[in-house]
Amino acid sequence: MAEEFGSIDLLGDEDFFFDFDPSIVIDSLPAEDFLQSSPDSWIGEIENQLMNDENHQEESFVELDQQSVSDFIADLLVDYPTSDSGSVDLAADKVLTVDSPAAADDSGKENSDLVVEKKSNDSGSEIHDDDDEEGDDDAVAKKRRRRVRNRDAAVRSRERKKEYVQDLEKKSKYLERECLRLGRMLECFVAENQSLRYCLQKGNGNNTTMMSKQESAVLLLESLLLGSLLWLLGVNFICLFPYMSHTKCCLLRPEPEKLVLNGLGSSSKPSYTGVSRRCKGSRPRMKYQILTLAA
């Protein structure tokens, strides 16, 4: 009777109507039950059930197994979507309250535990999702920062490269100008060297002519000096020797006269002529010897 009473109470719930087995009410009771049981007995049992106290009621009710209740709730959660979880929970709560207060307390605890577990799981999943999102955000931020750093480094490297190229261009231009300047200076030095060499060669030619002129002048002076010396010697010789020659002539003149006087003129003439010729020929020889000694 208690089971039938519980089934009738369950039929009163509209939310739990589709989960209830209607065969209990629809199936007709056998005739033997109707014959054996009278309406008075039924009424008496109902009055006894209503008049008894709570302890007797707890003993009379069939205790539900916690495992069966948890299996039933799990089946409900599996069969129905999450949107109907509230209605299923309400239906389960109603069933437990109808059956027994202790079972209701146990089922309430289990439901609260399940709800807490669900909330914890949901919160854990949300935290995990948040962590994943934060990790993704951190990875994206790191990538962005890395890209920004790479861009900045690339810009700085390009600027340094441009500055280095500009410095090299300036140095190359400066070196080109220096090369041109040094080339011009070298050309000037070469031209100056050639001109100096030409001047030296020209000066050497002038020196040779001057040397030849000087030599000729020296020779001329020497010849003049020699000539003057010879003239002086000649003058001295002429001034000194006429007296001697005159004395010699005076000494030799009386002999031919004497010979002529003695009648020997024919024999004396050749000797006189010879003496005179000898004296005439000796004078230029003496002059020549004096000149050679003076030179």
From Swiss-Prot:
Induction, per UniProt: By tunicamycin, DTT and azetidine-2-carboxylate. Isoform 2 is induced by heat.
Keywords annotated in UniProt: DNA-binding, Endoplasmic reticulum, Immunity, Membrane, Nucleus, Transcription, Transcription regulation, Transmembrane, Transmembrane helix
Tissue: Expressed in seedlings, rosette and cauline leaves, stems, buds, flowers, siliques, immature seeds, anthers and pollen grains.
Transmembrane segments: 224-244
A GO molecular-function descriptor: sequence-specific DNA binding
Record bears the keyword Transmembrane: yes
GO biological process: endoplasmic reticulum unfolded protein response; immune system process
Disruption phenotype: No visible phenotype, but reduced induction of ER stress-responsive genes. Shows enhanced susceptibility to a bacterial pathogen.
UniProt domain comment: The C-terminal transmembrane domain is cleaved in response to ER stress and the N-terminal fragment containing the bZIP domain is sufficient for transcription activation.
Descriptive protein name: bZIP transcription factor 60
Organism: Arabidopsis thaliana
